[in-house]
UniProtKB/Swiss-Prot annotation:
Residues 11-31 have a biased composition (Basic and acidic residues). Binding to DNA is inhibited by zinc ions. Disulfide bonds: none annotated. It comes from the Bacteria. It comes from Mycobacterium tuberculosis (strain ATCC 25618 / H37Rv). Keywords: DNA-binding, Metal-binding, Repressor, Transcription, Transcription regulation, Zinc. Pfam families: HTH_5. Residues 74-97 bind DNA. SUPFAM superfamilies: Winged helix' DNA-binding domain. GO terms for molecular function: DNA binding; DNA-binding transcription factor activity; metal ion binding. NCBIfam families: HTH_metalloreg (NF033788). Homodimer. Transcriptional regulator involved in zinc homeostasis. Represses the expression of the smtB-zur operon in the absence of zinc. Could act as the metal sensor that controls the expression of zur in response to zinc availability. This is HTH-type transcriptional repressor SmtB.
Length: 135
């Protein structure tokens, strides 16, 4: 059988990795996966879904990244993100309701901070992954 250099042959098809979406994966990747325990209770899955929905907006992702550095008041977030104050306040309300941020009054302003820095890791991983795909 004659093949062109760009046509893979059977000898080249199973080289131990396949290309999926720009990422390398072992050809037999599912055989190597550990067996996972039973899924968490439905309440935990629902709570995780709510948390991820609260983070699922570009402005809210940017807010979490800003608060990762230090606590901020609304006008600091407006200046850093270049979005209108009512929009920042609306997104902070959603993040606060989801338990992502907390607010503490300081004089006439409210200082917002992350309730849990584990959430910053989720956002950082998502942003890093999106950046890999953009290259």
């Amino acid at each position: 059988m004659v093949t062109s250099p760009s046509t893979p042959t059977a000898a080249h098809e199973d080289v131990g990795a396949d290309e999926v979406g720009g990422h390398q994966h072992p050809a037999d990747r599912f055989a190597e996966c550990p067996t996972f325990p039973a899924p968490p209770p439905r309440e935990i899955l629902d709570a995780a879904g709510e948390l991820l929905r609260a983070l699922a907006a570009p402005v809210r992702i940017a807010i979490v990244l800003q608060l990762r550095e230090s606590q901020r008041c609304v006008h600091e977030l407006v200046d850093a993100l270049h979005v209108p104050q009512p929009l920042v306040s609306q997104h902070l309300k959603i993040l606060k309701a989801a338990g992502v941020v907390t607010g503490e009054r300081s004089g006439r302003e409210v200082l917002y901070r992350l309730a849990d820095h584990h959430l910053a890791h989720i956002v950082l991983d998502a942003v890093a992954h999106a950046g890999e795909d953009a290259i």
